[in-house]
Amino acid sequence: MSRQKYLQMVVTLAVLSMPFSANAADAPINAGAGTTVTVGDNYEIEMTGNGSTAVAAAQNANVTLGNDAKITVDGDSAYGVQTNGENSKIEFGDGAGIEMTGNAAVGVETSADNSHIKFGESAEIVLQGDYNYGASVWSENSSIEFGADAKITAVSNAVRVGGNDSQAIFGADAILTTSGDNAYTVHLGAASGSSITFDNGAVINSDGHASIGVFIERSGEVSFKDQAEIKVTGDFAYGVYLQNQYDGNVSKITFGDGAQIEAHGYNADGIHVEAENSTAEFGDDTVVIVSGEDSTGVSFGGAGSKGVFGNNTYIEASGEYSEGVYAGGEGSSIEFGSNASVVITGNDSYGARVYAADAVINFGDDAVISVSGEDAKALCVSADDALIKVGNNAQITAEGMNAQALLLWADGNSGKIEIGDNATITGNADTDYQSNLIQVMSENGVIEIGDDVKINYNYTGTDEVIGSALSVTDAGGKIVIGNGAVIRVDGFDGGAEIIGDGGEISFGDNLDLSIVNTSYANGLRVAGEDARLVVGDNAKIHINGSYSDGVLVGASGYDGMSAAFGKNAQIIVEGDSSNAVRAEAWDGKGAKVEFGADAQIIAKGDAVMGVSAGGENTIIDFTENVNVTIGTETVPSNNGSWGIEASSGATVNVDGLAQINIFGEDSMGLQAVSTGKIILERAIIKAVGNNTTAVLGDENGGEIYIGGNSIVEAEGEGAKALSATAGYV
């Protein structure tokens, strides 16, 4: 008997003993232990029956099929191809096709240890029915390998690896698709040592409720080369999911360049890492797009988990409560290279948020972070000892009702946001209560911004509102900004404010701050108990609005606050009833403001004030020269404008030369009342206007000291150079 006839007889006997019918020309293959079966091209098997297996290999058996093999099986719990014996091997040529119809069916599976199945190019596996698996490595030290252009379509699971130290390997341009609820397109479930790898151009699709594109259940690694695409659609769907385990196992997923991950549906996430100490790595040009309420682009919730992204990452999220980047595991970290973009649309959304102790999100240079929506926040740290860091040249934008660019909102003591040099931070916001573009609401938390920042805060509504570009509202909070800051506020009423006790805001040299189109504005405000403002040299503060303050240090019921300016400060207010510099504190310790050399104080409008100090122990100190100008000759400041006033035990002191020019009717150059004190080492005081007084006092004990070589002049009908009563010198 020839070998060919012998094999045909063996196969025929095997077929007759099985509980199914074979209708095709070619018989099923059931290779016995230690046998070798080889068939040529275009081999076709059609089977019907529950529990059927079209191609099987027992222990140490080897089966080889040529090109364009076709297997069709109709039946529940059936197998298209199965290694059911150890050390067995099944190999297909190019163009293999496997179609399974029935529930709990498996297209290809290694069921015995040390067994292997291999396909050439263009293999296709299609399964119809629930709880099915396209390719399953269900044994240890085993593998299933596909050449280029493999395609698997299933309802429940396209590929799974459940055996330890096993592999599933896909060549270039693989396409894997699932369509059922709770489906896993790629599933790595082994406890240790296993992997699933994809060459360039892999496409992973999953469409169903709670479906997952790539699921690492326990440990091991899934890796993709360049240009991978993952798309999931359905509520609670995840593009990539690394599940947390409590047995210490660690998982990893890696992508080459050009990966694109999409997740669409309620509570859908693009990348979701819960596994502790696990890693997700991405090359350059990664794109993550999610949509749906509560959706998140990148989420790392596992303690010690780590995400690494190359350059040019783009993350987009849309939907209420959506987030771009989220670090929620203690000690977790997410790092981006240069040119990252995060674009978020939705109410109560976040661009990037840290919500766990010691967690970090780090963006490289040239990052673009944009949020749009009511109560949206571009960058938010809401955990102690946590950090968001952004490199140079960042562009950060927040738009919408109460939208914020930077928010430090931590329960502990040392949350932090760091922004590099040359940043542009923009807010285009409406508000229904007090809103702040950059805010520290964390005890002892810190926001640091480098040199040459441009901050633009624009009110888009129509009502008068309260809102500051910079705000420290909690005790001990701090904002530190480098040299060359340019701050433009349009419609809101605050430039920078410190409300928290012991809080601090500091600027380097060359601060340029302006506020327009508002009233009751405060350029720089220090209101917290023992709070402190520090401003370097050459600062310019320009406020255009009535009832406003250029610099306001003090608040009712608080004291001990202070402000210090370097040399060449210029404070300008334009608007009726406004004050250029005002310090008021009434609880004993007083407030203190100090200016370096050659300060300029300018106030324009009716009933304006240049410098005003009030309250016991309150001091405004000009260390070397000051120029105070109220009104102009062509546009005078009438109706009781003042150059310098001290009241209620406060002191204004000028070392060097004080030049004070007052233009306006019924106005005053100097006034000290109610035990207030003004001390000028040398002065040139000129008051121009009807009923104007250069130096004015009353009977309540105010004191004015003007040193030698001073000049006091008054011009106008009823004008007086000096009107001194009790207490004046």
Regions picked out by a protein language model, each given a short descriptive name:
Residues 23, 35-51, 63-77, 90-104, ...:
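Beta-strand-rich solenoid/repeat architectures in extracellular/passenger domains
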Residues 25-33, 53-59, 79-86, 106-113, ...:
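Glycine-rich beta-solenoid repeat tracts in large extracellular/virion proteins
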Residues 193, 247-250, 412-413, 558-560, ...:
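Short, solvent-exposed loop/turn segments that connect beta-strands within catalytic domains
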